Amino acid sequence: MLFHLFYPLASNLKILNIFKYLTFRTIYAMITALIVCFVLGPWIIRKLEGLQARQVIRTDGPESHLEKQGTPTMGGLIILTAIILPTLLWADLTNVYIWLTLFIIVGYGLIGFMDDYLKVVKKNTKGLSARQKMFWQVLLAGGVAVFLYVTPGFNEMLYVPFFKNFHPDLGIFFIPFVTLVIVGASNAVNLTDGLDGLAIGPVAINAATYMLFAYVAGHATLSAYLQIPRVVGAGELAVICGAMVGAGLGFLWFNSYPAEVFMGDVGSLSLGGTLGVIAVLTKQEILLVIVGGIFVIEALSVIFQVGSYKYRGKRIFRMAPIHHHFELKGVAEPKIIVRFWIITIILALVAISTLKMR
């Protein structure tokens, strides 16, 4: 909005030329997101408390979690507001990738909102069924996949980090692959969101990493020099990534241990889906497995736990996702959280190193 309002006036007022610079708009999207969190956060938390939108704590989990009973949830509304508003203010709204990403943010946010609303406000403990959530997730992600598949100029090749000459053409299989990336990322972040600040920290780190890759992918000279796929217009996604970083840090102010609010499904499903679609649009889908390694480990721990119990009658972990396993082993919650953040930072550095290791 500000880009379209002020940049056309740059011919009369030279200082407004600054709006054409992606770095400037990305930084201010980040700052704006932080401000939105700090201004709206306390108000939204009070409203959630007034609605009795309080987290239901599992009785079969770690005993320390019983202290969290009564903490308001659905705080993802703070995050989504802090991402959407700065994006609308600072991004180039003629860019189709911006609208595809906003489509996933809002769409997956609505799925999570309905699930949270039914569970914590309407006191329907089941919320949306797993099938209902999966149906809508696949439908929205599939819609994005089909749109990209039929869009001229967007290739269906799969680019693999560390291998500059290996990029198989997925053809029609591009559609289910994209759907899997978006849905998988969404649910992996959702599974990770079990401790105070555990999910939002890695989400912010992932967003910062993709902010760099989006900028490079959209830059003709840098993408050619670093030999990563050039995606015309993808650089604008750095603005959304910047807003995600700012929103993540702003929400962490309230969500850090001991949390004043939880993000709920409205936040986790939407944030995961957003990371997935950005990975697809920047042609860095495989990179998400590296930088989002914590999310992958959390998801795999659940899959292995369920599979082992179903076919062997034995559990691999004391409890899944794996962060609960460490809790039951006696590791303090803050230590688990910070260690997972450290691992994510290391994985982000490995992911960034792929820019040169090709």
Curated annotation (Swiss-Prot):
The keyword Secreted does not apply. Pathway: Cell wall biogenesis; peptidoglycan biosynthesis. Keywords: Cell cycle, Cell division, Cell inner membrane, Cell membrane, Cell shape, Cell wall biogenesis/degradation, Magnesium, Membrane, Metal-binding, Peptidoglycan synthesis, Transferase, Transmembrane, Transmembrane helix. It catalyses: UDP-N-acetyl-alpha-D-muramoyl-L-alanyl-gamma-D-glutamyl-meso-2,6-diaminopimeloyl-D-alanyl-D-alanine + di-trans,octa-cis-undecaprenyl phosphate = di-trans,octa-cis-undecaprenyl diphospho-N-acetyl-alpha-D-muramoyl-L-alanyl-D-glutamyl-meso-2,6-diaminopimeloyl-D-alanyl-D-alanine + UMP. PROSITE patterns: MRAY_1, MRAY_2. It comes from the Bacteria. It is an enzyme of class 2 (transferase). Its EC number is 2.7.8.13. The chain crosses the membrane at residues 26-46, 71-91, 93-113, 134-154, 170-190, 197-217, 234-254, 261-281, 286-306, 335-355. Its cofactor is Mg(2+). GO terms for cellular component: plasma membrane. Belongs to the glycosyltransferase 4 family. MraY subfamily. HAMAP family: MraY (MF_00038). NCBIfam families: mraY (TIGR00445). Catalyzes the initial step of the lipid cycle reactions in the biosynthesis of the cell wall peptidoglycan: transfers peptidoglycan precursor phospho-MurNAc-pentapeptide from UDP-MurNAc-pentapeptide onto the lipid carrier undecaprenyl phosphate, yielding undecaprenyl-pyrophosphoryl-MurNAc-pentapeptide, known as lipid I. This is Phospho-N-acetylmuramoyl-pentapeptide-transferase. The lineage of its organism: Bacteria, Pseudomonadati, Thermodesulfobacteriota, Desulfuromonadia, Geobacterales. The gene is mraY.
